[in-house]
């Protein structure tokens, strides 16, 4: 066993022990249902990781709860707060600036003082003692959660999709049904953009048609090779004549692409990429967040996914594009660099047949 793997497993088991110990000190009272949905006026949603895709996939929750008169507070990091800052359905943000112990205690006290009617812990995580600290500080609120590591902290543990066979967006329906009972709820993604950002992008695009290529994700397993990028670029030029091809991603990554005179956005902030997606015609991406943004705006999309490392967590299934105009290509291995050239060329051809203007 490699040393890094050993230390990862050691942290895993130490966190499990600490979580279970803390749960006995601050065990939540079990209350299997909300007796009066009309009394739910304030809600905390816990989303304190770096995954923007999670925020997008459950964005319907913000809209649906707001329509019921619920004031939503979102616990997230600075990146998530900036991304959702223009969403008028969210009442306020609590930003987790640090995971330092003293900072976490201060955050926990602040959350406890706000006194929420309901707390939603909608995502599964690896065992985290800091996460259990947050939950233990909210024991006076009704906590609806989906992560089996924290069952003892919840008022109600929801076993939705324990076998991980459904898309994550279906969880929004389960949350709303738990609070309000059976009813018609929309799981359409709900994104909000600043007017000035949209205006700048519309001016930048003009009357041109746009194909976005996002070839280099934040994770190593979501980064195409330069040869793969060249293949995709040439195929797009062939099948999308008279379209502008705009590359998006981190500026420092885009500088490394060995293609002369590629076009990129003149804006660094990610919110401009979101706006560009809204006004684009086609999207090609390895970035799951961008794939879900494209789904929010019903854009024909070619999405490249790594295969899951373990069958127990089929990430390419539960975080799939979730849109009928999307083509999902799953690598035969856990990295997209192993998608072969024939698959790349054929998938671009297939994309060109969807709603082409």
Swiss-Prot record:
| Pathways involved | Bacterial outer membrane biogenesis; LPS core biosynthesis
Q: Which UniProt keywords apply?
A: Glycosyltransferase, Lipopolysaccharide biosynthesis, Transferase
Record keywords: Transcription included?
A: no
Show the GO MF annotations.
ADP-heptose-lipopolysaccharide heptosyltransferase activity; lipid A-core heptosyltransferase activity; lipopolysaccharide N-acetylglucosaminyltransferase activity
Name the phenotypic consequences of knocking out this gene: Mutants are sensitive to phage C21.
What does the entry list under GO cellular component?
cytosol
Provide a GO biological process annotation.
Answer: lipopolysaccharide biosynthetic process
Gene3D superfamilies noted in UniProt? Glycogen Phosphorylase B (3.40.50.2000)
Q: Which reaction does it catalyse?
A: alpha-D-Glc-(1->2)-alpha-D-Glc-(1->3)-[alpha-D-Gal-(1->6)]-alpha-D-Glc-(1->3)-[L-alpha-D-Hep-(1->7)]-4-O-PO3(2-)-L-alpha-D-Hep-(1->3)-4-O-PO3(2-)-L-alpha-D-Hep-(1->5)-[alpha-Kdo-(2->4)]-alpha-Kdo-(2->6)-lipid A + ADP-L-glycero-beta-D-manno-heptose = lipid A-core + ADP + H(+)
UniProt keyword annotation of Nucleotide-binding present: no
Which Enzyme Commission numbers does its entry carry?
Answer: 2.4.1.-
Domain of life from the UniProt record: Bacteria
**InterPro entries xrefs:** Glyco_trans_9, LPS_LOS_Heptosyltrfase
Question: Which top EC class is named for this enzyme in its record?
Answer: transferase
PANTHER family on file: LIPOPOLYSACCHARIDE 1,2-N-ACETYLGLUCOSAMINETRANSFERASE-RELATED, TETRAACYLDISACCHARIDE 4'-KINASE-RELATED
Its job = Transferase involved in the biosynthesis of the core oligosaccharide region of lipopolysaccharide (LPS). May catalyze the addition of the terminal heptose (heptose IV) to the outer-core glucose III, the last step of the lipid A-core oligosaccharide biosynthesis.
| Name this protein carries in UniProt | Putative lipopolysaccharide heptosyltransferase 4
């Amino acid at each position: 066993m490699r040393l890094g793997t050993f230390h990862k497993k050691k942290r895993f088991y130490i966190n499990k022990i600490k979580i279970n110990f803390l749960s006995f000190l601050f065990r939540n009272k079990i209350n299997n249902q909300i007796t009066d949905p009309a009394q739910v006026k304030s809600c905390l949603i816990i989303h304190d990781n770096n995954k923007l895709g999670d925020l997008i996939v459950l964005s319907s929750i913000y809209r649906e709860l707001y329509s019921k008169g619920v004031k939503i507070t979102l616990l997230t990091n600075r990146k998530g707060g900036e991304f959702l800052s223009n969403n008028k359905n969210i009442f306020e943000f609590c930003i987790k600036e640090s995971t330092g112990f003293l900072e976490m205690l201060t955050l926990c006290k602040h959350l406890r003082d706000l006194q929420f009617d309901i707390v939603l812990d909608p995502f599964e995580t690896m065992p985290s003692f800091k996460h259990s600290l947050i939950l233990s500080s909210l024991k006076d609120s009704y906590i609806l959660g989906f992560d089996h590591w924290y069952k003892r902290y919840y008022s109600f543990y929801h076993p939705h999709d324990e076998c991980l066979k459904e898309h994550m967006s279906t969880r929004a329906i389960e949350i709303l049904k738990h609070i309000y009972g059976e009813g018609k709820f929309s799981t359409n993604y709900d994104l909000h953009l600043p007017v000035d950002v949209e205006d700048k992008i519309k001016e930048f695009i003009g009357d041109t048609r746009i194909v976005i290529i996002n070839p280099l994700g934040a994770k190593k397993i979501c980064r195409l090779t330069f040869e793969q990028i060249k293949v995709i670029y040439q195929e797009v030029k062939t099948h999308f004549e008279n379209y502008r091809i705009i590359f998006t991603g981190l500026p420092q990554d885009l500088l490394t692409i060995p293609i002369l005179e590629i076009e990129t956005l003149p804006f660094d902030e990610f919110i401009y990429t979101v706006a560009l997606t809204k006004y684009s015609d086609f999207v090609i991406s390895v970035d799951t967040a961008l794939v879900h943004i494209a789904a929010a705006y019903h854009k024909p999309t070619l999405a490249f996914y790594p295969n899951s490392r373990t069958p127990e967590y089929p990430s390419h299934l539960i975080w799939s594009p979730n849109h009928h105009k999307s083509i999902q290509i799953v690598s035969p291995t856990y990295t997209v660099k192993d998608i072969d050239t024939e698959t790349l060329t054929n998938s671009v051809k297939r994309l060109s047949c969807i709603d082409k203007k």
